[in-house]
């Protein structure tokens, strides 16, 4: 009886993973033929201790196979992923890391590489990724797992939330949650080339 229950639970999980991967592949199918994707970006920085949010405008540039750039205020603020290298520029000061050294960015890199390949990379086996779908919106939540309490304290972000419009294949938003607030990028005016 226990074996039967275990097999049934395993089968259900496998079926759910396959369905989630299929939803994701449909949502990002448009990226399969696009080499470059551009959009207008709006960045909202929210700090719990501050009453007003800081809002700025910029651009999103995505290039296959693994480059994502969100540039704000003429380059003073930038979030850049080039393969496994991540560069964050805040008020002109650069901070660089890689997904090989900084594990919180591993799944983030895999998800974006999968988006840019039109879903060719399988994301269903990522242990720190959950997906949900409501109407035309597919939400991907990456919650990085720390190896120790010390590593958890050093993490810049507690989670990343991406929303994709399944009808238009557009990445609608990227939210990076951190202690005491969040940074959210919303995107519009897409051009697929």
Question: PLM features: what roles do these ranges have?
Answer:
Residues 54-57, 74-76, 82, 155-160, ...:
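Short, surface-exposed coil-to-beta transition loops
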Residues 44, 75, 179-181:
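Hydrophobic lipid-interacting interfaces of membrane-associated proteins
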Residues 130-193:
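Gly/Pro-enriched, hydrophobic low-complexity segments
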Residues 4-13:
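Sec-dependent N-terminal signal peptides
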Residues 22-25, 30-33, 40, 45-46, ...:
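Flexible, processing/modification-adjacent segments and terminal tails
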Residues 15-19:
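Sec/Tat signal peptide C-region and signal peptidase I cleavage site
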Residues 41, 68-72, 86-90, 140-142, ...:
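Short hydrophobic/aromatic-rich beta-strand segments that constitute the beta-sheet cores
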Residues 59-110, 183-184:
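An acidic-aromatic
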């Amino acid at each position: 009886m226990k074996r039967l229950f275990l097999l049934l639970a395993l089968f259900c999980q496998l079926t759910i993973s396959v369905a989630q991967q299929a939803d994701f592949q449909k949502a990002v199918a448009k990226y399969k033929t696009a080499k470059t994707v551009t959009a207008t970006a709006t960045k909202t920085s929210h700090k719990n201790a501050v009453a007003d949010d800081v809002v700025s405008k910029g651009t999103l540039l995505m290039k296959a196979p693994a480059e994502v750039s969100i540039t704000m205020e003429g380059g003073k603020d930038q979030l850049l992923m080039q393969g496994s290298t991540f560069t964050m520029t805040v008020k002109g000061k650069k901070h660089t890391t890689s997904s090989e050294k900084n594990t919180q960015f591993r799944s983030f890199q895999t998800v974006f590489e999968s988006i840019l390949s039109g879903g060719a990379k399988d994301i269903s086996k990522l242990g720190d990724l959950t997906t949900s779908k409501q109407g035309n919106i597919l939400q991907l939540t990456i919650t990085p797992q720390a190896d120790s309490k010390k590593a958890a304290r050093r993490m810049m972000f507690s989670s990343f939330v991406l929303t994709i419009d399944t009808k238009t294949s557009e990445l609608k938003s990227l939210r990076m949650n951190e202690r005491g607030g969040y940074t959210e990028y919303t995107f519009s005016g897409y051009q697929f080339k």
